[in-house]
A protein has these predicted regions:
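Walker A/P-loop phosphate-binding motif and the immediately C-terminal alpha-helix
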Residues: 35-73, 188
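Phosphate-binding loop that captures ATP/GTP phosphates
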Residues: 66, 71-116, 128
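Phosphate-binding P-loop
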Residues: 28-34
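Glycine-rich phosphate-binding loops of nucleotide-dependent enzymes
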Residues: 107, 131, 150, 163, ...
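Phosphate-binding/switch loop-helix module in NTP-utilizing enzymes
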Residues: 113-161
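Conserved Switch II/interswitch segment of TRAFAC-class P-loop GTPases
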Residues: 141-148, 154-155, 166-187
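Residue-level signature of catalytic and energy-coupling elements of molecular machines
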Residues: 33, 44, 70, 78, ...
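C-terminal lobe/tail of nucleotide-utilizing enzymes
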Residues: 1-21, 188-275
């Protein structure tokens, strides 16, 4: 039997000294990203992309260089939120992301389509591969915080992101509905399985504030987030209201104009990943 040369990638033997291979993909050598924050939800329709864009804006207002990687390949919306329509171009070094009015870097599959309304009809592994290429092929320029807008659920893309990108923390977006509690638990458990810290919850559509008396109206019923937060010993970082102004800003590509003060605790939790 030949002696071991220490290179497990070239050996098929299942010995006790075998080292587990890292699945982390290499960042484009011309790119620089300090921290990666994944924004996830257990189900669709809870406003995860809205929260992602607000977090990016809030962090940019603190003087940080920010990027948004739109990993929702079949339902991309980051270009709409920021009013960008095309990348800065590409060369032999890689692909340059779009730049928003305030300098937020954005990469999305919709920036690469001839017609943004065309559907992306790909199977799971191809979609996951495209997301990985947004890490390996895109030249993220001196990004302090890269926010990854994940597709809902716990399928191929979240698994690829958690395995391939050096995710520093996860923000879980929820809404106040019974079914969501069970689905949110799945998202927490997946992050735990991948050994990625969950920074906390952001409850979107938490309430509607009456324009006449200022009373908070629970449009979607009683929230159960306190119970699940206690179950997993995780903080609730924000409760965001139903705000037609935010929805209008999102649809018009004006998210950089919205008030993000309600996310100050979430921003603080993200900044603590630097410690």
């Amino acid at each position: 039997m030949s002696s071991c040369n220490g290179n497990c990638s070239e050996c098929g033997s299942d010995c006790a000294d075998r080292k587990p291979e890292s699945l982390l993909a290499e960042l484009n050598p011309n790119a620089s990203v300090k921290k990666v924050i994944a924004v996830v939800s257990g189900k669709g329709g809870v406003g995860k992309s809205t929260v992602t864009s607000m977090l990016a804006v809030a962090m940019a207002r603190k003087g940080k260089r920010v990027g948004v990687l739109d990993a929702d390949i079949t339902g991309p919306s980051a270009p709409t939120a920021f009013g960008v329509t095309e990348c800065q171009g590409a060369d032999e070094h890689g692909l340059y992301p779009a730049l928003t009015r305030t300098g937020i870097q954005v990469m999305s599959i919709n920036l690469l389509l001839d017609n943004p309304a065309d559907p992306v009809v790909w199977r799971g592994p191809v979609i996951a591969g495209a997301v990985k290429q947004f890490w390996t092929d895109v030249i993220w320029e001196d990004v302090d915080y890269l926010f990854v807008d994940m597709p809902p659920g716990t399928g191929d893309v979240p698994l690829t992101v958690f395995q391939s990108l050096p995710v520093d923390g996860v923000i879980i977006v929820t809404s106040p509905q019974d079914l969501v509690s069970m689905i949110v638990a799945k998202a927490v458990k997946m992050a735990n399985m991948m050994h990625i810290p969950v920074l906390g919850f952001v409850e979107n559509y938490s309430y509607l504030r009456c324009p006449d008396c200022g009373r908070k109206i629970s449009v979607f019923g009683k929230s159960h987030l306190d119970e699940i937060a206690a179950q997993f010993d995780l903080p609730i970082l924000a409760r965001l209201p139903i705000d037609p102004a935010v929805a209008e800003a999102y649809d018009n590509g004006q998210m950089e104009t919205v008030n993000t003060e309600a996310l100050s605790a979430a921003v603080e939790a993200i900044e603590k990943t630097d410690v």
